[in-house]
Each structure stands twice: as structure tokens, then as C-alpha cells.
Amino acid sequence: MPSPRTRALTTPLPPLPAERSPVPPVFHATTWEVEDAAHLADLLSGARAGYSYSRVDSPTADAFAAAVRDLEGGAHAQPFASGMAAISSTMLALLSAGDEVVAPHSLYGNTASLLTGLLARLGVEVVWADLADPASVQAAITPRTRLVWAETMANPSMRMADLPGVASVCRVAGVPFAVDSTFTSPAMLRPLEHGVDLVVHSATKYLGGHSDATGGVVVGGEPAAELMTRIRATRIDLGGVLAPDEAYLLHRGLATLDLRVGRACATASELAAALAADERVEQVDHPSLPTHQACALARRLCDEGRYGAVLTVTPRGGRAAGLAMLDALRLIPQATSLGGVHTLASHPASTSHRQLDEDGLARAGIRPGGIRIPVGLEDADDLLADLQQALAVAVPA
């Protein structure tokens, strides 16, 4: 008989219960026992489905990705350690030296810096276009174009891409169309329904929804099977692995996604209407407003009444007034990120888009004094009162 020390390491695990748990289990294992050498070889080559090593695949992360896949109406999904891990793996999987990618100026700051920094050093060129105008995209596509990239709603301008129109252009050109749908989520808009090939999320935001877990996910339809295979291989090579505890928390957040997003969107629209009528406010960016670039697109593409849970408020008085308003907030905390249960506030020109110069900010639709307000689940009246008292400080009568 083996020694007690050895027995402590080799005691068989109990079998999984026959009863089904309504809560997904968490598997912390980094490695998995196999039947024989051929079994492991088949797992690593992809000839056989299963698990071998946690950097390759993990059942807890896969369960989360599969849930997002179903919400998006996709056929394939891959989990990642963060939204930027998902974005960078997608771009590096599809782009090589000499290739071009078509993208809008209104991009998340780190996506823009990835395109103009790392990918530029690798020999990839960005061709800028207006993704709300399919003709602009068509004019930007060349024989070297290997990817068209967009955001469903841009951070923080809330500009939208014409998903069906651009998808049609990409289909004719034979170019993959990928969108970052972080700001919308499948509780508001499902890009695959509009002809998009790949949908990317920072799951840290609305999918998780509680500001306590970091992750990302890429979803593709059946026609994108080969693209998803390349993205998975790049994830394995780069190591952007979603940890099991993070995957569990993100998966749990999906259960309340529809409730949270519906409430936050309704509150954001209410705040946008009230602030747009305030004489102390120069501009409010929110697709529910008739004056916003994305108003018609939002009504055509989004679920009814769900036109975004983020608004940007620019008080009269420029950058100084914006910062004064931000510092005067009492209920709403200053913090980065979005999509959680708490309403937050930040100054994009000095945070998420700090790497852009004045011209770059203007092209991205960001005003120097703009304050981004990702709306949470607080009562609208309480949020409005805080914003109005902060406006009174920033723009005195």
C-alpha cells in the first residue's frame, strides 16, 4: 500500500453528482488527467474535444463564453482575460505586415493606441473612415484591407456605426467585419443579426455588471468558423486566459443583464432629456436625443427604448467648467470603467483618451469639457439632483 503521504495526493475525487446544479461549477484545475498518450495528443491537436491545460481551454471559462454566444445568437465563442486581450488577439489573428484595417476615429483610447502603436510597428496601416456611412467604408477598402473594425456605440461620443450597411459593403468586398459591442451588450443590440462577422466585448462592463471581475469574449457566427479558429490559436499563443473565478462572476452577471441594462438605459434617456434642456449645458451626447448623430440608427438597430446607458455632458465654460463639475459631484463617484450597478463619472480628455491631442479629440467627437456618465441603477431623481448641483458650482449664475 502507498505511504500516507502518497495516499493524500492520490485519493480519488468523488464523482460529480447526478443532480444538476443551477449554478455553474468552478474548475480551478490547470491540468487534466487523460486516458493515455493518444488521448492527450488528440486533445492538443484539436482532433478531440476536451481539456488538457488551462491556458488552452477551461470548462468554467468556456461555460461563460457559451452563454454569451447564445445571447448573441452566435455559433462560436472564445473567452479572454480582458476586453483588450480579446481585441488585440482578434486583430493580431487577422492582420499581418502590409495589411490595412479600416476603422473610425471615434474609438476607445486603447484600441486606437493599439492600431497606431503596436500594429503600426508591425507594419499594419489604419485607414480611417466614417462607419456611419457605408460609402465612406467602401471608398476606404483596398485590395490590402483585411479587417473593418467598428464600435456599436463609441466611447464616449455614443456615435454609432451603420452595421447593416457596412456589413453589406464588407460582404461584397470579402473583408471580415468586427465590432466592439461593449457599450450595447446583447440586451440592447445583437450585431450578428445585422450581418457582422465578429462581436467583441469587454465583459468587465455590462456582461459582468458588478465591477468585480475582468474579462473579454469574442463571438462569431457559423460563417466565421475559420476566423474564430485563428483567434483561438492567437489567444493560446499570447496567453490572455480568463481565470475560473473571474469567469464564474461574469457568468453570474449574465442572469441580471437584461434587467440592469433596461433600467440603466431608461435612466440615461431621462437624464439626457433633462440636461439637454438645461441652459448651463452646452452639449449632451446620447442617442435618445433627436440632435444626436446616432438617433436614427439607434431607433433602427437597438431594442426599443434601449439607446445606451452612457451619456456625456459638456457644461458651458470649456475644460475648466467640466473639471469643476466633476469635482463638485457628491453622490456620483469619479472612477473609470462602466457597465456596473453604480453610476460613475470621468473626464475622457484626461483619462480614457488622454493620448489624443486636440485634433484627435475633435475627430473622436470628444469635447475638452465633456464629462462621461455611465449610468447605474440609482434613482434618476437622485442622479439628476447631483448633476444639477454640480452644474451650479461649475457654471454659476
Functional labels for PLM-detected ranges:
Residues 14-17, 76-280, 285:
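Conserved PLP-enzyme active-site core in the AAT-like
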Residues 2, 116-117, 125, 139, ...:
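PLP-dependent enzyme catalytic core of the Aspartate aminotransferase-like
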Residues 281-371, 375:
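Conserved C-terminal alpha-helix-loop-beta "cap" of PLP-dependent enzymes
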Residues 13-15, 28-34, 183, 205, ...:
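Glycine-rich beta-alpha junction loops
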Residues 1-48, 396-397:
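N-terminal glycine-rich, Lys/His-bearing helix-loop that initiates the first secondary-structure elements
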Residues 33-37, 225-226, 257, 318-321, ...:
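Short, acidic Gly/Pro/Ser/Thr-rich loop/turn segments
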Residues 31-88, 110-117:
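Conserved N-terminal alpha-helix of the aminotransferase class I/II PLP-enzyme fold
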